[in-house]
């Protein structure tokens, strides 16, 4: 049984309590390598049904590459054992102004078609008793992006995770992204983008603070 860090457990429970963990079925009994083998076996069947020749040198290892990619590279955010180690620093400097990390690169996967979501996030918070190591914000964004997602939920998950870890509601998150389920199929719109915003605490209650955050997002 995997023992989660305190922060990972807190975040998981907060998301479950708020209906923001709709898919996770509990602890996976199969080991990682066993899951890879099963995914590869199913992928072979799919490729065969597509009339692809798995004896071809270029395709022979594709089922295994896809299995590895799903478990190790694209979807590690499904396992809270991979939640980033969090560094909190006591706010001895009494910082009480907005801290913002802009242009956080994220790559996620549309849960409806398993196609790419390619975007950037901006995260702001106003410190209370602790501040967080800046790179940890990027890592939290990446963790929740590395799972099948819809952008609206992803934005809310990042917000609630940071509120839980930092012990303050004063957090704001905005994500700007291109969805390849729109760009590469269906309507095939190659220019549209989607922006989602989730605001907490003073970012929601104070028009001035909200506008300051929105101006930060729009900076070039």
Swiss-Prot record:
It is an enzyme of class 3 (hydrolase). GO terms for biological process: one-carbon metabolic process; tetrahydrobiopterin biosynthetic process; tetrahydrofolate biosynthetic process. The keyword Nucleotide-binding applies. One of its GO terms (cellular component) is cytoplasm. InterPro entries: GTP-CH-I_C/QueF, GTP-CH-I_N, GTP_CycHdrlase_I, GTP_CycHdrlase_I_CS, GTP_CycHdrlase_I_dom. Its EC number is 3.5.4.16. It catalyses: GTP + H2O = 7,8-dihydroneopterin 3'-triphosphate + formate + H(+). It holds the Pfam family GTP_cyclohydroI. Zn(2+) binds at residues 110, 113, 181. PROSITE patterns: GTP_CYCLOHYDROL_1_1 (PS00859), GTP_CYCLOHYDROL_1_2 (PS00860). Pathway: Cofactor biosynthesis; 7,8-dihydroneopterin triphosphate biosynthesis; 7,8-dihydroneopterin triphosphate from GTP: step 1/1. One of its GO terms (molecular function) is GTP binding. Keywords: GTP-binding, Hydrolase, Metal-binding, Nucleotide-binding, One-carbon metabolism, Zinc. It comes from the Bacteria. Toroid-shaped homodecamer, composed of two pentamers of five dimers. Belongs to the GTP cyclohydrolase I family. This is GTP cyclohydrolase 1. It comes from Baumannia cicadellinicola subsp. Homalodisca coagulata.
């Amino acid at each position: 049984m995997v023992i989660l860090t305190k922060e990972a457990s807190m975040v998981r429970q907060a998301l479950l309590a708020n209906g923001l963990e709709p898919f996770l079925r509990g602890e996976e009994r199969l080991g990682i390598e066993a899951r890879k083998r099963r995914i590869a076996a199913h992928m072979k069947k799919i490729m065969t049904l597509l009339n692809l020749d798995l004896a071809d040198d270029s395709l022979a290892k594709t089922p295994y590459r896809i299995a590895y990619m799903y478990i190790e590279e694209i979807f590690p955010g499904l396992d809270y054992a991979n939640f980033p180690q969090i560094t909190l620093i006591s706010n001895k400097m009494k910082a009480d102004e907005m801290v913002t990390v802009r242009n956080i690169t994220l790559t996620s996967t549309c849960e409806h078609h398993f196609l790419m979501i390619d975007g950037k996030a901006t995260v702001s918070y106003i410190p209370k008793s602790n501040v967080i190591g800046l790179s940890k914000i990027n890592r939290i964004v990446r963790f929740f992006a590395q799972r099948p997602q819809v952008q609206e939920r992803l934005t809310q998950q990042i917000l609630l995770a940071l509120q839980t870890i930092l012990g303050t509601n004063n957090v704001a998150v905005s994500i700007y992204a291109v969805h390849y389920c729109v760009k590469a199929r269906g309507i095939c719109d190659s220019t549209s983008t989607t922006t989602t915003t989730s605001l907490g605490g003073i970012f929601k209650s104070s028009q001035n603070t909200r506008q300051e955050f929105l101006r930060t997002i729009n900076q070039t």
